[in-house]
From Swiss-Prot:
GO cellular component: mitochondrion
Domain called tr-type G: residue spans: 31-310
Species: Drosophila pseudoobscura pseudoobscura
Function, in words: Mitochondrial GTPase that mediates the disassembly of ribosomes from messenger RNA at the termination of mitochondrial protein biosynthesis. Not involved in the GTP-dependent ribosomal translocation step during translation elongation.
Gene Ontology molecular function, alphabetical: GTP binding; GTPase activity
GO BP terms, alphabetized: mitochondrial translation; ribosome disassembly
NCBIfam families per the UniProt record, alphabetical: small_GTP
Annotated compartments: Mitochondrion
Name used for this protein in its record: Ribosome-releasing factor 2, mitochondrial
Main subcellular location of this protein, as a coarse class: mitochondrion
Binding-site list for GTP: 40-47, 104-108, 158-161
Family: Belongs to the TRAFAC class translation factor GTPase superfamily. Classic translation factor GTPase family. EF-G/EF-2 subfamily.
Length: 737
């Protein structure tokens, strides 16, 4: 094939050789990359696992410990002080001939947006479970996020050195709570010294780590004939049987062989890899990151079972050799300015290259860096499939798609549409990049608001600049200006989120801002349908502006805006230009952002346009303002009810403390869903409670339980309120409570 190509006409031999060499290099380079995320519930040991990977790969010379505050990936002051991950961080390290790009993500629910954006950059994930707790609340959240991105995954059961660890329960949790098909390729055991060892199901070996050299080396021992070996052989046979039902190649061998013992390890691994990449199974491994057990085999599994970049993201093949890169994070460096983390999906990014983001802005890459958390090594170019940090991008935001030019983007869009059979080659239409490539920019609703004030008037500009930079890093941070009070208002995902923002502004920007009291982000919904006509006529700068709109608000959880299709109104609406309808829609929907009672977003409400008469020469801005004014009038007429945010809590405490905790919860308007046994001495309470009643609840729970209880909390939607609670909420918002 190569000989034929070199002697075919139409292209100089040297140029063809260069192109073939570049293509072959890219393919082999890409096949040796693994882009992975590491996900977990808070305190499952995710960051410790990452630090061990860096140490054993030779990337770091000492073990980073969360409790010592010397980790590579948790480099923010707030992360090291609190012992939690707040921002996603990217690290690159070599392992057995491959290059692993790993994204360490937060485990706390307040920073779930960090996880969501990081998953756009990876091809597979490792989900870390606490061996003493199994699948927890945030485990379910991150698993659902991985499902959304269709990511192959491995499960790593950590803390298996602990006496209360339960491997079988963790595996059962994966099967029942996450509705997946776990495949155990390791089982825990103990050596004669009582230390954790691992039995490998595929090789039938016992793996023992050496504590004297910090787990750098481990021995493999073939199990002697015994009950342990017989049980492990049964597990191996079960694994082969399970995989043969999912993989045709393995099934053919099983059918033709006389015994499962004749099925080679390599054949099992290949079948398991195919099943994992197709998301049919989840391989389960185990270890203890803190005790330095099992990490090397976890990295081996990343290489063996998770996909290379070229096996994923085929939708971007439409770019050919042009650049396609997904922006998944932005950080601000004091010396280098904004640094943009990009997953290169196709093509090659070089230093000095000009790029276009999917929103149309032109950018120039001044420098490129290889990621290692907050340390950077400059490089000249980075190939498809890799992760890179770009300096010099000024307008790009998280979620943008970067490409070589607008022409390259348009051509890729059209090729993709043609491959889907939805557009002809010569059709010229405006295409939605986000919709076409499945880019979701949806930002979760804030659950808390508070005002933010600089220490002095002279610090106002610096504070606004700091907020702009933090908002570019963290899309879930909302910043707005309240025209009524004249205050800057922050919206965030929780108390911890807001506290971290204040702390970062002080530590990174040296501005000691003052945050006002936290306000609950209530929503509003209409009590009853209402219809009205608003006619406005004014003369502005000598031009007559004339608008008459008939609008209605109705209860509806679907579209925000619709047209009345009744015969008497349809003829009028058909005369309106699409642009005019869009202007009316934009003005109408904007009025739903601020309800009449507490300024909350109006939800479960649809605006219906019945009639519109617009005078010649009337400006779009005037039409938009009239539509907003009409909807505001309707909301006041119909009246609104308040909806309050509800949180789902999981509380684990000793059995003797449960009654006191439940009594306190009942005073907080909580709905107790279930009380389940949790081990021999503990119970777990599953409860929903209004966020307004949970201010400072962590401290209260510690007091009630004498420090023996633990809690996780995450948003669980909104719920209506009775008249008394509504009145209290209004007084709180007005600052009267």
């Amino acid at each position: 094939m190569l000989k034929y190509a070199l002697h075919s006409g139409g292209m100089p031999r040297n140029r063809l050789l260069r192109q073939l060499s570049a293509h072959i290099f890219r393919r082999s380079y890409s096949s040796n990359i693994r882009n992975i995320g590491i996900l977990a519930h808070i305190d499952a040991g995710k960051t410790t696992t990452t630090e061990r990977m860096l140490f054993y790969s030779g990337k770091t010379r000492s073990l980073g410990e969360v409790h010592r505050g010397n980790t590579v990936t948790d480099y923010l002051t707030q992360e090291r002080e609190r012992g939690i991950t707040i921002c996603s961080s990217a690290v690159t390290f070599p392992w057995r001939g491959n290059r692993i790009n790993l994204l360490d993500t937060p485990g706390h629910i307040d920073f779930t947006m960090e996880v969501e954006q990081s998953l756009y950059a990876v091809d597979g994930v490792v989900v870390v479970l606490d061996g003493t707790a199994g699948v927890e609340a945030q485990t379910v959240t991150v698993w659902t996020q991985a499902d959304k991105h269709k990511l192959p995954r491995l499960a790593f059961v950590n803390k298996m050195d602990r006496p209360d660890a339960d491997f079988d329960k963790c595996v059962n949790d994966l099967r029942t709570k996450l509705e997946t098909q776990p495949v155990c390729i390791q089982y825990p055991s103990k050596n004669q010294d009582g230390l954790l060892t691992i039995n490998d199901v595929i090789t039938l070996e016992q793996l023992t780590w050496q504590p004297k050299d910090l787990g750098r080396s481990y021995s493999k021992t073939k199990l002697e004939p015994s009950d342990d070996l017989r049980q492990l052989q049964e597990k191996r046979n079960e694994l082969i049987d399970q995989l043969s039902g999912l993989d045709d190649e393995l099934a053919d061998v099983v059918i033709s062989t006389e015994s499962f013992d004749n099925v080679s390890n390599a054949l099992i691994e290949r079948a398991l890899r195919r099943a994992t990449c197709q998301q049919k199974v989840v391989p389960v491994l185990l270890g203890s990151a803190y005790k330095n057990v099992g990490i090397q085999r976890l990295m081996d599994a990343v290489n063996t079972y998770l996909p290379a970049p070229e096996e994923r993201n085929q939708i971007y093949d439409c770019f050919g050799n042009e650049v396609a890169g997904k922006v998944f994070k932005i950080v601000h460096d004091k010396q280098r300015g904004p640094l943009t983390l990009v997953r290169i999906l196709r093509g090659e990014i070089k230093r000095g290259m000009r790029l276009i983001c999917s929103r149309g802005q032109a950018e120039v890459v001044s420098k490129l860096y290889e990621p290692l958390a907050d340390e950077y090594r400059e490089v000249g170019a980075v190939q498809s499939g890799d992760v890179v940090i770009c300096a010099g991008l000024k307008s790009t935001v998280t979620g943008d798609l970067l490409t070589s030019s607008q022409t390259a983007l348009r051509n890729a869009q059209k090729r993709l549409k043609q491959s889907q059979g939805t557009v002809s080659p010569d059709e010229d239409e405006e295409l939605d990049t986000d919709e076409l490539f499945g880019i979701d920019r949806q930002i979760p609703d804030a659950v808390y608001f508070c005002s933010i004030e600089p220490p002095s008037v002279s610090s106002q500009t610096a504070m606004e600049q700091a907020l702009r930079q933090l908002q570019r890093e963290d899309p879930s941070l909302r910043v707005s200006y309240d025209s009524v009070t004249g205050q800057t208002v922050l919206g965030g995902m929780g108390e911890l989120h807001m506290d971290i923002i204040k702390s970062r502004i002080l530590s990174e920007y040296k501005i000691d801002v003052d945050l006002g009291p936290l306000q609950i982000a209530y929503k509003e919904t209409i009590e009853s349908p209402s219809l009205t006509t608003l006619s406005v006529e004014k003369e502005i700068a000598g031009s007559k502006q004339n608008v008459s709109l008939t609008l209605e608000v109705v209860k509806d959880q679907g579209e925000l805006f619709s047209l009345d299709k009744s015969p008497e109104n349809l003829s009028n609406l058909n005369t309106l230009r699409p642009r005019t309808l869009q202007v009316i829609r934009k003005g109408s929907v904007s009025a739903l952002e601020r309800g009449p009672r507490v300024g909350g977003q109006v939800v479960d409400t649809q605006i219906r346009l019945h009639n519109a008469i617009i005078g010649r020469g009337t400006a779009d801005s005037f039409v938009m303002a009239t539509a907003a004014q009409c909807v505001q009038k309707l909301l006041s007429t119909s009246g609104t009810r308040l909806l309050e945010p509800i949180m789902a809590l999981q509380i684990v405490a000793p059995s003797e403390r449960i009654s006191g905790i439940m009594a306190d919860l009942s005073r907080r308007r909580a709905l107790i869903n279930d009380v389940l046994p949790k081990g021999e001495r503990n119970k777990m309470i599953l409860v929903n409670a209004p966020l307004a009643e949970l201010s400072g609840y962590s401290s209260a729970l510690r007091t009630i339980s004498s420090g023996t209880a633990s809690m996780t909390m995450q948003p669980s939607g909104f719920s209506g309120m009775n008249a008394v609670d509504e009145s209290l909420a209004e007084r709180r918002v007005q600052g009267l409570e």
